[in-house]
Structures are given as C-alpha cells and as structure tokens.
C-alpha cells in the first residue's frame, strides 16, 4: 500500500534500493522544499541519501552526496560486490538559484539554454557510509 514518506522533495525522480545483505532501504532524493513558482516546484539540490530500517515507514537522512546552484536529477544506483554504491546522476546549472536559494524570478531564455550544459556525474560511495 502506498503512503507518504514524509520527506520533502520537488518534482524530481528518486532512486530506491535495498542495501546489499540487509533489510535496510536506501533512498536517494532531492532534499528541498516545494516551491510553487519554481520551474520544477522546488530546487533539485542537494542530492541526499536516507536509510529506512522499517520497510520505508520512517527515514533517517544520512547526508548529502552533492549540492550547489544546480539541478541534480535522473538518479541511478547499482551496488558492487564490495557493497559500495555507484551513483550516477545528471548535473546542470539552475539559473533560478543563487547561493542555494530560489531567487524568486523566472529564468530568461538565455539562462534556460545554459541548462543544456549537462554533466553526467558518478559517485562511488563506500558501504559503511550508509551505516555510519
């Protein structure tokens, strides 16, 4: 049965995985508030991770993987035999953010075109980071 996670997030994809050799769930998501005027209803930064040891009924934030005046989205994750996670995601400038805060005005056409300067990112996260 579906239920709310109680985690704040804009319009952005998440990535849910089970920690290898464990019943714990790991969620990667954008830990930011809903902003109705923003083009994705909130800032897609930071890219964060949370763990659930009760089947997703409650979540504890572990930490941030990346952050900045950018959009961090299209998350994918696979675990290696060592238990380390390989997290891939897209990083692109968000002209509506200044110093981590929504500036309150819509981006210009030129600023939106700059969003096509995208980087594919990869992070290698050791297994023990999830259970620190």
Language-model features: where?
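Asp-box/BNR beta-propeller blade signature and adjacent active/binding-site loops
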Residues: 1-132
């Amino acid at each position: 049965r579906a239920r709310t996670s109680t985690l704040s997030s804009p319009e952005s994809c998440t990535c849910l995985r089970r920690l290898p050799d464990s019943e714990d769930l790991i969620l990667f998501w954008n830990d930011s508030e809903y902003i109705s005027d923003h083009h994705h209803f909130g800032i897609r930064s930071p890219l964060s991770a949370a763990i659930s040891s009760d089947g997703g009924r409650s979540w504890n934030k572990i930490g941030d993987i990346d952050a900045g005046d950018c959009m961090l989205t299209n998350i994918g994750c696979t675990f290696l035999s060592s238990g380390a996670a390989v997290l891939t995601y897209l990083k692109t400038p968000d002209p509506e953010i200044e110093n981590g805060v929504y500036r309150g005005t819509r981006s210009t056409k030129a600023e939106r075109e700059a969003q096509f300067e995208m980087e594919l990112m990869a992070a290698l996260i050791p297994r023990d980071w999830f259970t620190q």
